[in-house]
UniProtKB/Swiss-Prot annotation:
Keywords: Cytoplasm, DNA-binding, Transcription, Transcription regulation. GO terms for molecular function: DNA binding. This is Probable transcriptional regulatory protein PSHAb0060. HAMAP family: Transcrip_reg_TACO1. It comes from Pseudoalteromonas translucida (strain TAC 125). InterPro entries: Integrase-like_N (IPR017856), TACO1_YebC-like_2nd/3rd_dom (IPR048300), TACO1_YebC_N (IPR049083), Transcrip_reg_TACO1-like (IPR002876), Transcrip_reg_TACO1-like_dom3 (IPR026564), YebC-like (IPR029072).
Length: 241
């Protein structure tokens, strides 16, 4: 593949309001995972992954526990997934994943950032085919052959293993996430995953260098992040200041 996985940490966690947004996002995802499966992370792998991810992002334990208890009690909202695709500032490709209890409200909220930044929301599938749905695991290391051997011994369907600047990035189909992570944990005792994601990785990137377009892009992403129903935003833009 010839490309290292870049972890883009959002600046949204820098304010109290943004932290509340992060907590709300995880609370909703954990609630849905627990409600759609077993409310026990030892049985429900999706729930376990979300809990581990939430803890890494410093989501308070009471937020996690409340979401699971709410799902176990059978009460609460009925959420459905919604995905919107299109072209953002600089003609970058964008995927917006949502959880919603009101699809009409959600499409209205998501469409607004596109409209306000002269971007274009498209039809389902218009850009998703230009992204790979990957499990991505990143950790310190410099020997890709040893990592690849450990994964192949566990019969993991590996797409790629990259090494760059003392960091190993493992790419596998998203369906291989738990298998790949378990294989690495068993092969390398005490492994610490700096990247632990199921995500959409763009097949090609687009560089944005114009200051006005960069400002418009920042506005676009901020407006999407402010939408209550938006859970994840994926794009292929690389900002060059």
């Amino acid at each position: 593949m010839g490309r290292a996985f870049e972890v883009r940490k959002s600046s949204m966690a820098k304010t109290a309001n943004a932290k509340t947004k992060v907590n709300s996002k995880y609370g909703k995802e954990i609630y849905v995972a627990a409600k759609n499966g077993e409310p026990d992370p030892d049985v429900n792998q999706t729930l376990r992954r979300l809990i581990e991810k939430a803890k890494k992002d410093q989501v308070p334990a009471h937020v996690i526990e409340k979401a699971i208890e709410k799902a176990a009690g059978g009460a609460g909202e009925d959420y459905s997934t919604a995905r919107y695709e299109g072209y953002g500032p600089g003609n970058c490709m964008v995927i917006v994943d949502c959880l919603t209890d009101n699809p009409n409200r959600t499409i209205k909220d998501v469409r607004l950032p596109f409209t306000k930044t002269d971007s274009k929301i498209g039809t389902p599938g218009c850009v998703a085919h230009m992204f790979d749905h990957f499990a991505v695991l990143g950790f310190s290391g410099d020997d890709d052959e040893v990592v690849l051997e450990a994964l192949m011994m566990a019969d993991v369907d590996v797409t790629d293993v990259e090494v760059e600047d003392g960091k190993v990035s493992v790419f596998a189909p998203h369906t291989e996430y738990f298998k790949a992570k378990t294989a690495l944990e068993e092969a390398f005792e005490g492994i610490n995953f700096e990247v632990d994601e199921i995500t959409f990785v763009p097949q090609v990137h687009i560089e944005i260098t114009d200051e006005e377009v960069i400002a418009n892009f920042d506005k676009f992403i901020t407006m999407l992040e402010d939408c209550d129903d938006v859970q994840n935003i994926y794009h292929n833009a690389i900002i060059k200041n």
